[in-house]
Amino acid sequence: MVRVIGLMSGTSLDGVDAAGIETDGVAVGAAGPTVTIPFPPELRARTRAILDRAGSLRGDDPELLAVERDLTLLHVAAVRALDWPAELIGFHGQTILHRPAEPRSWQIGDAGLLALETGVPVVHDFRSADLAAGGEGAPLVPVFHQALARGMARPLAVLNIGGVANVSLIGADGALLACDVGPGNALLDDWAMRHTGVPCDRDGALARAGRVDAAVLAGLMGDPFFARPAPKSLDRLAFHRAMDLLAPLSPADGAATLAAFTVRAVASLPLPFQPCRWLVCGGGRHNPVLMDGLRERWGAAGARVEAVGWDGDALEAQCFGFLAARAVRGLPLSFPGTTGAERPVSGGRVEQRGLPVAATRVLARLRQG
């Protein structure tokens, strides 16, 4: 096994997560340290402005390049703060656009700068190969969930509530299925920021003070996304019309309705089998209103991933460390049942230019298995 640092900056724009993991891309060994470097408010605002303009941006846009550099340096700071002797880095980058129908998924981040600043080979560009093979480019975390869940009772579902919510379904026979299921925290975060100046509904306080508007919720659930068969994926801004539907509501009622939207989207997902357990990861598991709504539907079958010893705050970062090792070995990152790709697909590109030979020997070790 090798020591890999995974780096993740999600669409919620709350910070850069860094996590160490020992892995060979097949098995998951010991977990290393973890750290989160919060987005400075100014960088969050600039990144959000890039998200809003991404559909019309060129790759040489000066502000885009400036934001990309500052985001990369924030990732460098996360690696240094971890202070762990990594041999490889998995760098997801910051998604600013995800349109699989085009097909296009755009993650910004300078892998070359990251490699030079840390002295460690960097694996990046995890989604392009899947898109080229007819896949959605997301979600990519299911194969990591499957590796972590080895030996657990099945069938099992792992729900990640990040900016977008996605689910990994592991069948009794080990079959792996997955898809994005609907909004996660992104809409609720945007609503809270607009009405309270705080970038999230902390502890679900705003939603708990409000009432769900049934008519608005029905309108939200009428989005064509929910009629599409899985596998399917979402851009963070996919439900942009939600803000127009919510406009007449009070801040509290809007938050309550958005929380109910996330829960209803999960509950309405057609399942090929009934999981014996639901495990929840991602920032949404910290929202009591979301968790209460999910538990009403799952009962005792639902729990946070901490119940089985996983670190719910580090899971996505750990995943990209795991995927980095798989990518170097040429192992599949996605499958027909997880992204809709026509075949199992590997992916990722390795950035090692300018590094000493000693720093890149890990690549040969991994490729030899």
What are these regions (language model features)?
Residues 54, 58-109:
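Short beta-strand-loop/turn "lid" adjacent to the catalytic site in phosphate-handling enzymes
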Residues 3, 100-105, 112, 116, ...:
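Phosphate-binding/catalytic loop of phosphoryl-transfer enzymes
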Residues 96, 275-297:
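Glycine-rich phosphate-binding loops at beta-strand->alpha-helix junctions
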Residues 30-70:
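Conserved non-catalytic scaffold segment of RNase H-like nuclease domains
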Residues 13, 260, 306-356:
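Glycine-rich phosphate-binding/hydrolytic loop that grips phosphoryl groups
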Residues 15-40, 44, 177-263, 339-365, ...:
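Conserved ATP-utilizing enzyme core subdomain
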Residues 74-82, 251-274:
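Phosphate/ATP-binding catalytic cores across multiple sugar-kinase/actin-like superfamilies
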